[in-house]
Curated annotation (Swiss-Prot):
Classification lineage: Bacteria, Bacillati, Bacillota, Bacilli, Bacillales
Protein residues bound to NAD(+): D34, A35, E36, Y37, D38, S83, L84, E113, R136, E170, K286, K310
Enzyme class label: ligase
BP GO annotations: DNA repair; DNA replication
Species of provenance: Halalkalibacterium halodurans (strain ATCC BAA-125 / DSM 18197 / FERM 7344 / JCM 9153 / C-125) (Bacillus halodurans)
Protein name, UniProt field: DNA ligase
Keyword terms, alphabetized: DNA damage, DNA repair, DNA replication, Ligase, Magnesium, Manganese, Metal-binding, NAD, Zinc
Active site: K115
Family: Belongs to the NAD-dependent DNA ligase family. LigA subfamily.
Record domain BRCT: where: 591-669
InterPro entries reported in the protein's UniProt record: BRCT_dom, BRCT_dom_sf, DisA/LigA_HHH, DNA_ligase, DNA_ligase_AS, DNA_ligase_CS, DNAligase_adenylation, DNAligase_N
HAMAP family given in the database record: DNA_ligase_A
Cofactor: Mg(2+); Mn(2+)
Gene3D superfamilies for the chain: 5' to 3' exonuclease, C-terminal subdomain, 6.20.10.30, BRCT domain, DNA ligase/mRNA capping enzyme, Helix hairpin bin, Nucleic acid-binding proteins
């Protein structure tokens, strides 16, 4: 076949397969048999192999998966992928409605959607072509899993409109696919997946896209993150638009004109959810009007215009076999119930937290008891109560120890606390847990250093404190179980990258008592070098908004310890950054004088000097509000390179337009 003939045939096959795939996977209305579809796909693959220069990353043939990837790259989300606040009762929903109406008035309506139990994803399209897909990650930074997402048939590779946009959705594994996968794993002598959510997440984190393609995943799209050249006034209007350009939208979504209708919708799914072909763990309720959403805004963690109703936790009965003790990084000794394995909310549960000695005494929990277990919020296993009527007389009371189970030091109960605590700073359990915390995502974010690797390193005597992580070498790491050369090289690169982390990550990672990630950011903004923070007095600390007396006293006490100062000096000598890299705190007077104060700003095009996330953070610190689309309410558009339809629309609406140079100048003053 001549090249020109092949090109025409390939394009025809692609169009046919796209149309058949859309009807089968999105509309659930197949036009041809599976055998006919497979025959056309094989014909396309053969032609693309014969003419490799005609291959395309939007061809339906990529659904079968490409070559294995060396690792997943990290990518920054254009706008953060926030979590949602939770509701557990009708009253919680009414309270949410009351808070909304206090801000926007009584003319509020809602969009309701099933909360799919899967993996949150972000998809980016440029001129209608799928160019990047990522996991949620920590909400700001995720992993690029584009190649694996291309294998999901319901995710369009080309849209029906040449639009540039970002959408949010949920990738999931249908129940039928999950059952088939577990049957295959069992037949192969492998461990079964606990639930479809874990199976979906594991499938999308396969480095070999061909394996992901065999897992038969699906995806629903539920929101637009940003879109160029399209003004949408409501959430349900946005969903309808997404459907028309080729996305799979959950047909069970509903528009509700009052909170009573929302509650009826929620309650209707309490029984019906078991009949769905996929798992759901609740209902998402969103204020429908986009302008109302903007008025309500966001907290640090979630939008104020949306909430997730979580279904009541499933409760089951099992036997409490034993109570074991765990020592955390702060020395708190937590009793854990060891249970006869039981399935709760689709997950095999073997352990549940008992929190502290007072709870054990209060519930009269004994070894051998029959207990009721549930998963609070369908996440954390919890012992609800004891079925004392089932006791046989062989059950044994449990007493908390007087000494640490890890190091033997005497346990203490600090004033005002119910927990028993080991106060030995050399306790191996505390050191190990502290190391795990230091490398975690919100702290130094060292990929490849999970709990198992840290435990191995610690038990082999290769690390004793966090500074030792930066002294690890290739030969030492190759001695560990399941660590090949590629894994070791990636890990060493990740350790090296973490040295550049901003000061707030290091502060959070050090595990100073009472200092969470938000407080660490506040401290770093006000004391932008480790030297300044180490010298800060108690009075200087409590003068900072959000730093209370207890936290200030803890920080002063922490930096008074010689071993702490030795550790920090050692980290600095190993090249770990000791300065704050983010925007400086802005005073009220400076905000009032800012060119962004009270203005709605839109960013478009590629920025060179800083990322969109950095620009957004700095504009908002100076009193501005950054949104994703241009409208009559937009005050200012910042246009980077290759600015598209947003720039055109801004000109039509006579909106003020800046280039990147003007932006950098404004945020630098």
């Amino acid at each position: 076949m001549e090249r020109n003939d092949a090109e025409r045939k390939i394009e025809k096959l692609r169009n046919q397969l796209e149309e058949y795939g859309y009807h089968y996977y999105v509309l659930d209305k197949p036009l041809v048999s599976d055998a006919e579809y497979d025959g056309l796909m094989n014909e396309l693959i053969e032609l693309e192999e014969a003419f490799p220069e005609l291959k395309s990353d939007t061809s339906p043939s990529v659904r079968v998966g490409g070559p294995p990837l060396p690792h997943f790259e990290k990518v920054e989300h254009r706008t953060p992928m926030l979590s949602l606040g939770n509701a557990f009762s009708d009253q919680d929903l009414r309270d949410f409605d009351r808070r909304v109406r206090q801000v926007v008035g009584d003319e509020v309506t809602y969009s309701c959607e099933l909360k799919i139990d899967g993996l949150a994803i972000s998809l980016i399209y440029e001129s209608g072509r799928f160019v990047r897909g990522a996991t949620r990650g920590d909400g700001t930074t995720g992993e690029d899993i584009t190649q694996n997402l291309r294998t999901i048939p319901s995710i369009p590779l080309r849209l029906k409109e040449a639009v540039s946009l970002e959408v949010r959705g949920e990738a999931f594994m249908p129940k039928r696919s999950f059952e088939a996968l577990n049957e295959a794993k069992e037949a192969a002598g492998e461990e079964r997946f606990a639930n479809p959510r874990n199976a979906a997440a594991g499938s999308l984190r396969q480095l070999d896209p061909k394996l992901a393609a065999k897992r038969h995943l699906d995806a629903f799209i539920y929101a637009i993150g940003s879109v160029e050249g399209k003004e949408l006034h409501s959430h349900h209007e946005g969903l309808n638009y997404l459907k028309t350009i080729g996305f799979k939208i959950n047909p069970e979504s509903a528009y509700c004109e009052s909170i009573d209708e929302v509650i009826d919708y929620v309650n209707s799914w309490l029984e019906r959810r078991a009949d769905l072909p996929y798992e759901i763990d609740g209902i998402v309720i969103k204020v429908d009007n986009v302008n109302f959403q903007e008025q309500l805004g966001y907290t640090a963690k979630s939008p104020r215009w949306a909430i997730a109703y979580k279904f009541p936790a499933e409760e089951v009965i099992t036997t409490l076999l034993d109570i074991t003790l765990n020592v955390g990084r702060t020395g708190v000794v937590t009793p854990t119930a060891e249970l006869k394995p039981v399935t709760v909310a689709g997950t095999t549960v073997k352990r549940a937290s008992l929190h502290n000695e007072d709870l054990i005494r209060e519930k009269d929990i004994r070894l051998g008891d029959s207990v009721v277990v549930k998963k609070a919020g369908d996440i954390i296993p919890e012992v609800v109560n004891v079925l004392t009527e089932l006791r046989t007389g062989e059950e044994r009371p449990f007493s908390m120890p007087t000494h640490c189970p890890e190091c033997g030091s005497e346990l203490v109960r600090l004033e005002g606390e119910v927990a028993l605590r080991c106060i030995n700073p050399q306790c191996p359990a505390q050191i190990r847990e502290g190391l795990i915390h230091f490398v975690s995502r919100q702290a130094m974010n060292i990929d490849g250093l999970g709990e198992k690797v840290i435990t191995q390193l610690f038990e082999h005597g290769l690390i004793h404190n966090v500074a030792d992580l930066y002294k690890l070498n290739k030969d030492e790491l190759l001695q560990l179980e399941r660590m090949g050369e590629k894994s070791v090289n990636n890990l060493l690169a990740s350790i090296e990258t973490s040295k550049k982390s901003s000061l707030e990550r290091l502060l959070f990672g050090l595990g100073i008592r009472f200092v969470g990630s938000k407080a660490a950011k506040t401290l770093a903004m006000h004391f932008p070098t480790m030297t300044e923070l180490r010298r800060a007095s108690y009075d200087e600390l409590i003068a900072v908004n959000e730093i209370g007396e207890k936290m200030a006293a803890s920080i002063v006490s922490y930096f008074e310890k010689p071993e702490v100062n030795e550790l920090i000096d050692e980290l600095a000598s190993l090249g770990v950054n000791m300065t704050y890299n983010g925007p400086k705190p802005i005073g009220e007077e400076e905000i009032a004088d800012s060119p962004f104060a009270g203005k709605t700003v839109v960013l478009t095009g590629k920025l060179q000097a800083l990322t969109r996330g950095e620009a957004k953070e700095k504009i908002e610190a100076l009193g501005g509000k950054v949104t994703g689309s241009v409208s009559k309410n937009t005050d200012l558009l910042v246009a980077g390179e290759d600015a598209g339809s947003k720039l055109t629309k801004a000109k039509e609406l006579n909106i003020e337009i800046w280039d990147e140079e003007a932006l950098v100048k404004a945020i630098s003053h």
